[in-house]
Amino acid sequence: MRERLGVTGIGVVAPNGTTTEEYWAATLAGRSGIGPITRFDPASYPARLAGEVRGFTARELLPSRITTQTDHWTHMGLVAADRALADAGVRPADLPEYEMTVVTASSSGGTEFGQKEMTGLWGKGPDHVGAYQSIAWFYAASTGQISIRNGMRGPCAAIATEQAGGLDAVGQARRMLRSGARLALVGGTDASLCPYGLVAQLSNGGLSTLADASRAYVPFDEKACGYVPGEGGAMFTVERIDGGREPGGPIYGYIAGYAATFDPPPERERPPTLTRAITLALEDAGLRPDEIDVVFADAMGLPHADRAEAEALNAIFGPHKVPVTAPKTMTGRLYAGGAALDVATALLSMRDGVIPPTVGTTDPVRSLGLDLVLGRPRERTLRTALVVARGFGGFNAALVLTK
């Protein structure tokens, strides 16, 4: 008998909503959080739009001792984790400390904290670099801070597979739950909207340079020209439903199937492996392609990448056979936070029986053969969902959720 791993709590911090229900209401209404960068003056950079999380003040939500030591990305992870636990009705003190685990994903670490410290180093010298730089930048900082804050002393991990990380973190948490953990606090956030971070992102050539926020990120569109970066993400509580604790509320859904693959180097001239990742995830879930009710796409917004994803989906489902959506068009690409947020969105979609829209995309490439949910939500009974993610460098991941 397969284990039942249920998602019992969700916490979201996103550009179009700083709580789960704010985000969900904005997403169903098609309200975008993408706009001009305000965190610094972007005038000298070719990309000047981002999905910033506005109205989020860490010092109002976390102790000053923590905010002083940690980066903005960790602040969002801590708050999302707090909200996921509260949503699940979990009091960590009531559970054995070695049976709780934390897994987070990050693709950039604490770049904003590092920006401040490098500015001090460049302008004033090494005596003006704080000691906390040594821990605030590190990819595992969020995992460490969340586990300390909640007294979770079981096996923990940090995943760095770019946007695929949000799904890979769930896969790693599943392994830990299968190995005896009772509860996992899992997800991903990222925040790299500072000069240092933006320069690093520009290096991959994928960022849109359009100034029109409504047209800058339009995946699967005839005028697709890249993606807009963003910040934020989501955290979840995942529990073994037979683990001895009665869930404090409804179960959003179950982790039914997961798989990850890695693309061969371009010079090998072998095809990418996203199709295989999806196939393996479906097999892991014990589901046929025609049993998937909706796909949450990676939707990179680069024409060649969009076509590769469409070809993978069509190879499995056939053209126009399953609704496909990309709500991240309202937040920007959140890197490790993006796939985690897609998982949250998929779970909320199954809860409410509605598929949120892809916004901005108005002239879809017909030859891609996708049944895109455009413009407005689509009501539909949803029992299953597939979330797809790709990370720069060849990472692919697929996650199947069931109700």
Language-model features and meaning:
Residues 7, 22-24, 28-161, 189-198, ...:
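Conserved beta-ketoacyl condensing-enzyme motif
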Residues 77-90, 139-142, 147-150, 156-189, ...:
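Active-site-proximal alpha-helical scaffold in enzymes
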Residues 1-66, 88, 242-255, 344-359, ...:
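ACP-dependent fatty acid/polyketide chain-elongation machinery
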Residues 123-130, 171-175, 191-246, 322, ...:
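Glycine-/small-residue-rich "gating" segment that lines the acyl/pantetheine channel
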Residues 21-26, 111-126, 176-178, 198-211, ...:
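A glycine- and small-aliphatic-rich helix-loop capping segment at beta-alpha/alpha-beta transitions
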Residues 181-225, 258-271, 297-307, 321-371:
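Acyl-CoA/ACP chain-elongation machinery
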